[in-house]
C-alpha cells in the first residue's frame, strides 16, 4: 500500500465516522428517524411503510419499539413504551379516518375484546370528532407508556384524554398488524420485513 491509498482510507474513515449515528428511512417523502424517545426511553424504528387505498397514498406510518420485533405476538408483548407515527400524505376527513379505524378494529378484535375497551374506543372517536380534517403533512402520533396509557398527539400537541388500558393500544396496533390488516403491504413493512 502506498501513502496515497492509506490517506484515502483515512479520509474515508473520517467521513464515515462524522455521519450522524441515526439514519432516516424515507417512505413516500416522509423521513422516519431510526430512533425516538417516549417517556424518557429510547425507541428503535421497527419498520415503516405506506398505507394506500386503491391507488392513492393515504399516509406513511412507522412503528417504534424498545427492541426490534418481527412477529405480531412479539410486538404486542414487548415491554416498555411504544409509538406509532403517522404522517398524512393527503387530506382525509376525520369521519373517513375514524370509519377506517373502526373497521380495522372490528376486523381484528373479537366482540368481547371490544366490549372491554369500549370506553376508550369512544374517547378515541371523540378525538376525531374534534378535528374535521386530517390534512396533508399532519403528524398523528399514538404513544403507549406503561402505567399511564395511550396518548395521542396531532402535530406535537396532545389531543384527547389518556386511555389507560394496554389492551386498547394492542387493539389499535392490530389494525395494521392483525390477521386482517387495513393494508396488507403495510403490515410486513411495520414488522421490518421490507
Task: Describe each PLM feature range.
Residues 159-186:
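Flexible glycine-rich active-site/ligand-binding loops centered on an Asp-His dyad
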Residues 184-194:
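Cysteine/selenocysteine-centered motifs that mediate thiol-based redox chemistry or coordinate metal-sulfur cofactors
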Residues 3-7, 11:
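N-terminal export leaders
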Residues 18-20:
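N-terminal signal peptide c-region/cleavage motif recognized by signal peptidases
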Residues 24-78:
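N-terminal secretory signal peptides
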Residues 29-32, 144-148:
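A short, compositionally biased
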Amino acid at each position: 500500500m502506498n501513502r496515497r491509498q492509506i490517506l484515502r482510507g483515512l479520509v474515508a474513515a473520517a467521513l464515515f465516522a462524522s455521519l450522524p449515528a441515526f439514519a432516516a428511512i424515507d417512505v413516500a417523502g416522509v423521513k422516519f428517524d431510526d430512533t425516538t424517545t417516549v417517556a424518557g426511553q429510547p425507541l428503535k424504528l421497527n419498520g415503516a411503510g405506506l398505507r394506500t387505498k386503491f391507488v392513492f397514498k393515504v399516509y406513511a406510518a412507522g412503528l417504534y419499539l424498545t427492541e426490534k420485533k418481527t412477529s405480531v405476538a412479539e410486538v404486542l408483548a414487548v415491554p416498555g413504551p411504544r409509538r406509532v407515527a403517522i404522517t398524512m400524505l393527503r387530506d382525509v376527513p376525520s369521519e373517513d379516518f375514524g370509519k377506517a379505524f373502526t373497521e380495522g378494529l372490528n376486523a381484528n378484535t373479537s366482540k368481547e375484546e371490544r366490549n372491554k375497551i369500549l370506553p376508550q374506543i369512544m374517547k378515541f372517536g371523540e378525538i376525531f370528532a374534534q378535528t374535521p380534517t386530517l390534512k396533508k403533512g399532519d403528524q398523528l402520533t399514538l404513544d403507549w407508556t406503561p402505567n399511564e396509557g395511550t396518548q395521542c398527539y396531532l402535530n406535537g400537541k396532545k389531543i384527547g384524554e389518556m386511555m389507560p388500558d394496554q389492551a386498547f393500544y394492542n387493539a389499535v396496533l392490530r389494525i395494521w398488524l392483525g390477521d386482517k390488516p387495513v393494508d396488507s403491504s403495510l403490515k410486513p413493512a411495520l414488522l421490518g420485513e421490507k
